[in-house]
Amino acid sequence: PVDYPIFFSELSMVPDDIVPLKKSFYESPTSEGMDKRWSEWLIKWKLLSDSSTNVNTTAPHSCKELSKQMRLVNPKYSLREWFVMPAYQQATERNYSLVRELQDIITQPYAEQSKDVKEKYYRLKPSELFDIGGLSQYSCSS
C-alpha cells in the first residue's frame, strides 16, 4: 500500500531515484524486483513528463517547472481522520489547542512549514490504526 498524498508530494520534487518515494510505502519493498519495478516506473514517468509540453508554448516542461506545477496541485499536508479525532476529543473538553494547530497547518497545505510540523504531520498512518473505522479512513454517508 501507498500513502498517495505523501507519494505525490515526493514525486512533485521530480526525484532522480525511488528513495524519496519510499517514504510513502507502508511496506518497504523488500525484494529487488519491487525496487526494480518502481525504478522502471519512475523512468517511464520521467520520460513521459519530459515529452509533455507547456500549455502556453510548444516547449517541453523543465524539471523545475514540472515540480512547481505539481506542488501547486499536490498538497504536502492533508487533513486525516487520525489527526482530527484527537482534536475532536480534546475540543469536547474545551481544549481547542489541537484544533487550532490543525487549522494553522491545513490553511497552508502546500507550504513546507516547520521541521516540527513535518515530523508530526508528514508521516504514514500508524499500523495500529489500519482497521479502525472512523480513524483509518474518512467515511461517506451519501
Functional labels for PLM-detected ranges:
Residues 1-142:
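Regulatory N- and C-terminal appendages and interdomain linkers associated
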